[in-house]
Amino acid sequence: MIDYTQYPDARGHFGIHGGRFVSETLMAALEDLENLYNRMKNDEQFLAEFDRDLAYYVGRPSPLYYAERWSKKLGGAQIYLKREDLNHTGSHKVNNTIGQALLAKLSGKKRIIAETGAGQHGVATATIAARLGLECVVFMGAEDVKRQAMNVYRMRLLGATVIPVQSGSKTLKDAMNEAMRDWVTNVDSTYYVIGTVAGPHPYPQLVRDFQSIIGREARRQIQEQAGRLPDALVACVGGGSNAIGLFYPFLNDQDVKMYGVEAAGHGIETGKHSAPLNAGHVGVLHGNRTYLMSDPQGQIIETHSISAGLDYPGVGPEHSFLKDMHRVEYVPIDDNEALQGFRDLTRIEGIIPAIESAHAMAYVTKLAPTMDKDQIIIANVSGRGDKDLMTVARIDGIEMVEM
């Protein structure tokens, strides 16, 4: 049996995926980061500071909530929700930014940069930068700046410089391109806080490790509440950090099924989606080999999702590996299904999820009725939906005005 905790290998590979495909300029910085992380990941003082920040600044552990009404309505499995939406800054993203900010501080760099799609990673990075007194620059696609005006204002309030990226599709991919360019130019003074389990090694590993607090807590909580492990885990996948954070501590438990939910946009058959694990090809993007949305010549094609946070043409290399190994099943949910998931959770449980998380909720409505009533699903509510109210209101034909 495969021991999934042994990945990545020493060169950052998950099977054929991962690795470090970057310019020579960045090699030394990545090797320094890898060496620093390898020293710190078992350092008692570093881990104690990380745990202290998660407890007293973020508010962890996040609750594991039994969604009783929703479970009864769907008539199948019992549904538990991991409430990452209740973290400080409103999503799972802060788990990673706290860890990386501590690494940045140890590396002596005073300037941090980040890319962001929905704005949640940008907000989390700007928040930690404010707390540590670091200069912060956030790159965000111009299209996403329009979609997520509230988060842009939050970042600026926190003291960050937000740079709208006008190139390409003006979304997350382009923001990451610009962040990488900035890093190449300013590598000696700047630490790049990558927001997901993508990018060159060691980022997929260290982001996973920081986010795995989600699954470690959920594992303990479900055993306390139900006396056993769950039968299924469900989480949305863009780059895939919230999903790998939930999945990783369960990967060696063969009886626990796992479902990663990709953004099918207007539908897989239309080509207007963000589902590389369902309809992509292996290629190299942002420093790692993984499944990508690309044409037959290997060129990246434009993606679409109602969700800015899932609107990305790649995916973390560990997810690509888990697909190849048939350990995780990756399923598509389109924009309309995600909107219904958003409405269902809001109306039935009084929890307004992020549109990203709503993709996972939509899949729960399909999965739960196919399971027995004594079975258990844990679904990750990766973020809260305040940032998406304008988007949903527009779809509903409601004009939001200032009071």
Swiss-Prot record:
Signal peptide: none annotated. The modification N6-(pyridoxal phosphate)lysine is found at K93. Pathway: Amino-acid biosynthesis; L-tryptophan biosynthesis; L-tryptophan from chorismate: step 5/5. It catalyses: (1S,2R)-1-C-(indol-3-yl)glycerol 3-phosphate + L-serine = D-glyceraldehyde 3-phosphate + L-tryptophan + H2O. This is Tryptophan synthase beta chain. Belongs to the TrpB family. Coiled coil: none annotated. Its EC number is 4.2.1.20. The beta subunit is responsible for the synthesis of L-tryptophan from indole and L-serine. It comes from the Bacteria. One of its GO terms (cellular component) is cytoplasm. InterPro entries: Trp_synth_b_CS (IPR006653), Trp_synth_beta (IPR006654), Trp_synth_beta/beta-like (IPR023026), TrpB-like_PALP (IPR001926), TrpB-like_PALP_sf (IPR036052). It is an enzyme of class 4 (lyase). Its cofactor is pyridoxal 5'-phosphate.
